[in-house]
Amino acid sequence: EPYWGGEVYLDEIRYIDTGEDDSAAIAALASGQVDAIYRLGIPTLEIAERIPGVVVSQAVTAQTGVIRMNVNNAPFDNKKVRQAMVMASDNAQNLKLAHRGMGSVGENHHVAEIHPEYAKLPPLKRDVAKAKALLAEAGFPDGVQVTCNVGNTDGTWEQDSVQVLKENAAEAGIDITINVMPSAQYWEVWNKAPFSLTSWTHRPLGTMVLSLAYRSGVPWNESGYNNPEFDAELDKAESILDVTKRKEQMAVVEKILQDDAVMVQPFFRSVFTAAKDNVKGYQTHPTRYHQFNSVWLA
């Protein structure tokens, strides 16, 4: 049967596996072995931009790295410890250093500015002195030591992001040991470890990821967060069709999650790809889907 999407221009599409190393894909693009690549990471972005005849494209997304704390594991079962971690983080600095500023600053509630129901809350303020005071109130006047797992499952920016948090948190007396794991090994423990960075993909609605990741008892609730009030307010948001009214309700939802300090979520990141300049109509998709229905070769 004819393709439902109308006329297409390519006769054939071939995928070549260059392995997990982004530099191998860049080399294949530069040499002409391939016409385009699947993804372009931050470490290879500048290289691609300098290759003659190569065009880099970018998509603004809700993809993000969530440095979440499991609320059922010590010391994160103490809300004040979680609040201290959040208060010590400089999310804007994290975006700048870990992702070249390519994205938007996160607000620790996993809803992005590009989501239609996003509600703007008062800006977060870093307060190292307050973070220290919270630790003392939680029973850690001399600071606390924790280990954060990272698998670099979507690139080394994950490790860089945790490194920035480590340096921020040290000022407040929080000593973070970074446990870098193979990506396959990370996915074996991602929803079990007390403290980890997990890369979450883009979803078109903010309510979607909140239901997947923070609703009580759902399989992907890696933080172990369990708050009936949050669940009820999220139910209300999901029941509202009018976007303007849903924004008002989402302000309540976002604030609950932010106040409970479940995560440090430094930024939402832009994603990139690259292609030869004779490849027309090839664009980066927020979820990295390949859509070749309007791609053609000049």
Regions inferred by a protein language model and the residue ranges of each:
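Ligand-site clamp/hinge motif
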Residues: E1-I47, K166, D175-T177
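Short, solvent-exposed loop/beta-turn-alpha elements that line the ligand-binding surface or hinge
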Residues: P2-D11, E46-A59, R68-K79, A112-K130, ...
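Structural recognition of the beta-strand scaffold that forms the well-ordered cores
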Residues: R14-D17, D35-R39, V56-Q58, G65-R68, ...
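Short, hydrophobic alpha-helical packing/hinge segments within bilobed ligand-binding/sensory domains
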Residues: A24-I26, V34, T44-L45, V81-R82, ...
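Periplasmic binding protein-like
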Residues: A36-R39, S161, K166-R215, Q249-M250
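Append "and occasionally in soluble cytosolic enzymes with long acidic Gly/Pro-rich linkers
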Residues: R50, S57, D77-E167, N226-E229, ...
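Bilobed periplasmic-binding protein-like "clamshell/Venus-flytrap" ligand-binding domains
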Residues: E137-G155, T198-T201, L241-D277
